[in-house]
């Protein structure tokens, strides 16, 4: 305390104020956007039976790539390899989708059985040390970060709900949050130190999973890492709003530009409520990227000129692929055309973002 007092005396007023503000920021608990504080819905009926927990995945995270045999663009699916991949990861995706669905059901209906079931699923995987294998390839570490983002994002709704549903489940909550923290630390190791040419949407999704985990576990180090990864991503966006590493995906370049937006918009929204404004990073890179994507959806000609390929629009016809519009339009005052695109596709439900995205980002416009 004595040292702090001397510093305050010695420093000029403005610098001292900045230092003190920084100290307060560092000490403050990490929080989610306001929608995560929503109360649990009024109890409706009784919960059905709890489905069996998917077997905790504790094996090697070495999986077949669905693009196996493709060239460097990694843009052509290998149907046989994809079938193998889906079989290998079934327990993981069943866990992601199932746990998120249980949390959603509970938040809507208030049925204690759904809450107990969701927590039993997550604590079973936590106790087993699922997804923690040190034996992994690129596809395996990708599944680890996707699953962490899905599960921690869904759990966050329980953690911060004003109804305090976890108050009677302290032991299970501790097990689950400790597991998330271990996975978050591993994801940081998995995705740190990559050369710029290797940093693409995978790194952005890793950063989202770490941001979600940071808030759930109140880990400032994880929060800082996620913010730093966002800044790397923002500085990859060129003056026209393109991501050079996603242009490499040729016929899927537009789809992958769109796929890069959900994690980046979520990170920026979470950073904002914790006192870190990322909107102006690289002269408004996130906004340039979003506007470039929406223009491309309306007319893919610019992407075709950039890549020399007709764009595969299959994914872009799926409404939930635009779930990023919710956090984005909470950050920015979206123009009428973008708001209309959002309204036409709502409500958004994305298990990789923790479930009901529209429910937790209901305010239109931004500051």
From Swiss-Prot:
Span of the signal peptide: 1-27
Phenotype on disruption: Deletion of algL is lethal, and microscopic examination of the cells reveals that alginate or a precursor accumulates in the periplasmic space until the cells burst.
GO molecular function: poly(beta-D-mannuronate) lyase activity; threonine deaminase activity
Entry EC no(s): 4.2.2.3
Gene Ontology cellular component terms for the protein in this record: periplasmic space
Record-level GO BP terms: alginic acid biosynthetic process; alginic acid catabolic process
InterPro entries recorded: Alginate_lyase, Alginate_lyase_dom, Chondroitin_lyas
Catalytic activity: Eliminative cleavage of alginate to give oligosaccharides with 4-deoxy-alpha-L-erythro-hex-4-enuronosyl groups at their non-reducing ends and beta-D-mannuronate at their reducing end
Localisation per UniProt entry: Periplasm
Residues reported to bind substrate: 65-66, 138-139, 256
Keywords for the protein's UniProt record, in alphabetical order: Lyase, Periplasm, Signal
Family: Belongs to the polysaccharide lyase 5 family.
NCBIfam families assigned: PRK00325.1-2
The protein, known as: Alginate lyase
Organism, scientific name: Pseudomonas aeruginosa (strain ATCC 15692 / DSM 22644 / CIP 104116 / JCM 14847 / LMG 12228 / 1C / PRS 101 / PAO1)
């Amino acid at each position: 305390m004595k040292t702090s007092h001397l510093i305050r005396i010695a420093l000029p007023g403005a610098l001292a104020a900045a230092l003190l503000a920084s100290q307060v920021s560092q000490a403050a608990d990490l929080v989610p956007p306001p929608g995560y504080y929503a109360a649990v819905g009024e109890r409706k009926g009784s919960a059905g039976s709890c489905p069996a927990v998917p077997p905790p995945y504790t094996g090697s995270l070495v999986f077949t790539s669905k693009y196996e045999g493709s060239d460097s663009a990694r843009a052509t699916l290998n149907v046989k390899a994809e079938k193998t991949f889906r079989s290998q990861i079934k327990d993981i995706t069943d866990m992601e989708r199932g746990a998120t669905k249980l949390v959603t059901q509970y938040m809507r209906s208030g049925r204690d059985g759904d809450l107990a079931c969701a927590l039993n699923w997550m604590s079973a995987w936590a106790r087993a040390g699922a997804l923690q294998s040190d034996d992994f390839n690129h596809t395996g570490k990708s599944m680890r970060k996707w699953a962490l983002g899905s599960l921690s994002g869904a759990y966050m709704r329980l953690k911060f709900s004003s109804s305090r549903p976890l108050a009677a489940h302290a032991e299970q909550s501790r097990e689950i949050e400790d597991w998330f923290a271990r996975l978050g630390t591993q994801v940081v190791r998995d995705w740190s130190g990559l050369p710029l040419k290797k940093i693409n949407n995978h790194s952005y999704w890793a950063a989202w999973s770490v941001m979600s985990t940071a808030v759930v576990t109140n880990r400032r180090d994880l929060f800082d890492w996620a913010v730093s990864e966002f800044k790397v991503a923002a500085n990859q966006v060129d003056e026209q709003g393109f991501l050079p590493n996603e242009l490499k995906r040729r016929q899927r370049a537009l789809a992958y530009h769109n796929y890069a937006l959900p994690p980046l918009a979520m990170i920026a929204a979470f950073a904002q409520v914790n006192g870190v404004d990322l909107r102006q990073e690289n002269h408004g890179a996130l906004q340039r990227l979003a506007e470039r994507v929406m223009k491309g959806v309306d007319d893919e000609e610019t992407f075709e000129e950039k890549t020399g390929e007709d764009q595969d629009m299959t994914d872009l016809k799926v409404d939930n692929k635009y779930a990023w519009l919710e956090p984005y339009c909470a950050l920015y005052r979206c123009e009428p055309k973008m708001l209309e695109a959002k309204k036409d596709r709502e409500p958004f439900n994305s298990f990789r973002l923790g479930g009901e995205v529209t429910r937790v980002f209901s305010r239109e416009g931004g500051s």
